[in-house]
Amino acid sequence: LADGCQIAPTDAPNIISAADLVLWSTGFKRKANFVNYQLGQVMLDDASGLSETDIIVMQEVGKQSLTGYTVFGLDLGTTCHLIVSKSSGMGRMTVTHKYTIDYKVLEDELLRLIKIHRPTAIVSDTQPYIETVHRLQQKIQNLFGAMYINGNGLEPFRVIEKKSDETKSVLEQRQVNINRSVAFNILMDDIRESKIGLAFGVTDDTLTEHLTDMKRKARSEGTRGAVSDDSETLEYRWVKTKGNDHFHHALLYCHIASQLTQHRNISGGGL
């Protein structure tokens, strides 16, 4: 930064009045509800999202041996991000491997990793490559395509299959509609309840950056969105800060896949 100017709120009286300034600076029940994730040091608390402390806890949990089903969570993009985990089938999960895959070789590399790890269930992002997921589903019978929705209910996800919900399905085959905010909230809660671990050697700066990138922002009632003591917080929504959150999404898909092994009769093996 070569040049800069210091601007105070009172320098723009036609944009923000003194009364509004007082409201916005004092009318927050939680100071972390006054959000600016792009400039300066952010006011954060435990409700704002995952922190490096949470990552350390996940590493400690990951030291405990875990056997069970293998599940995949895949986030698509020019560079695809894959999380491989062991699921106990009873609510616990440990991340054992992570991979980055060039989209140009995704199909061959994914099939190779399936032969190595033999996942019971795979949940993959569908955007922006829905045709890729459809093609992969022809070869991989336990691959579910994930679609984010913004629902008002408490249900984190719902499986839609062609036979039962043909009019609601975007894919012709297996699809999982994920209630985005609710699912990320539950993922964070499970991490803090020591249900999700990171095995030795999995954690690095990239994973830490991705898991701590997104933060929760409160949607609430009140004057111009200010959260006062009398206002009621309706819900949180997860927002990007720097945009490096791909492994966080892959972990969520893996978390959903682990729940599919608990509630559905999915045969082992990927092919």
Question: What is the predicted role of each segment?
Answer:
Residues 27, 31, 65-67, 78, ...:
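Active-site-proximal structural scaffolding
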Residues 41, 45, 49-51, 55-57, ...:
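Mg2+-dependent endonuclease catalytic cores in nucleic-acid-processing enzymes, primarily RNase H-like
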Residues 62-91, 250:
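Gly/Thr-rich phosphate-binding beta-strand-loop-beta motif of the actin/hexokinase/Hsp70
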Residues 226-242:
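Short, solvent-exposed helix-loop connector elements
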Residues 231-233, 248, 253-271:
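Acidic two-metal-ion nuclease catalytic site recognized across multiple nuclease folds
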